[in-house]
UniProtKB/Swiss-Prot annotation:
Organism: Proteus mirabilis
Keyword Lipid metabolism: yes
Family: Belongs to the LpxB family.
Lineage: Bacteria, Pseudomonadati, Pseudomonadota, Gammaproteobacteria, Enterobacterales
One Pfam family matching this protein: LpxB
One GO-annotated biological process of the protein: lipid A biosynthetic process
Record PANTHER family: LIPID-A-DISACCHARIDE SYNTHASE, LIPID-A-DISACCHARIDE SYNTHASE, MITOCHONDRIAL-RELATED
Gene Ontology MF, one: lipid-A-disaccharide synthase activity
Function summary: Condensation of UDP-2,3-diacylglucosamine and 2,3-diacylglucosamine-1-phosphate to form lipid A disaccharide, a precursor of lipid A, a phosphorylated glycolipid that anchors the lipopolysaccharide to the outer membrane of the cell.
Entry protein name: Lipid-A-disaccharide synthase
Length: 141
């Protein structure tokens, strides 16, 4: 023990697993990475990331664009690849055992992944930006 009460044994840096599947998630994820790096400079981020998250230091196992699908036809065309990615991520995160997994928005992909990781004993968080549904002017006020 040191005088500050901290153990002098070297601890591994925090490891955070992240998955963002769209541009809005990349923006949120980059901000999260920046904020956490201020508190923990040696923190490590791994997972599925876009260019902004990668610029902040996230190691991308897959590019965010691989998850960005819209419409039933595109989803069906890419479903085998999406399922393979989710299976691979489940295995990789389970093996790595990050301190926490953060699914950033993209609920169609992340909610199932988060459930599987929880079953494996990992801590998970689903991180989304608040949204306002104001389709009519009177809902804004």
């Amino acid at each position: 023990m040191t005088l500050s009460g901290q153990s002098s044994i070297k601890q591994r840096p925090l490891v955070i697993g992240l998955v963002a599947g769209e541009t809005s998630g990349d923006i949120l994820g980059a901000g999260l990475i920046r904020a956490l790096k201020q508190m923990h400079p040696n923190i490590r981020f791994v997972g599925v990331a876009g260019p902004l998250m990668q610029a902040e230091g996230c190691e991308a196992w897959y590019e965010m664009e691989e998850l960005a699908v819209m419409g039933i036809v595109e989803v069906l065309e890419r479903l085998p690849r999406l399922l393979k990615i989710r299976k691979d991520l489940t295995q990789r995160f389970t093996q790595l055992k990050p301190d926490v997994f953060v699914g950033i928005d993209a609920p169609d992909f992340n909610i199932t992944l988060e459930g599987r990781l929880k079953q494996k004993g990992l801590k998970t968080i689903h991180y989304v930006s608040p949204s306002v549904w104001a389709w009519r002017q009177k809902r804004v006020f």
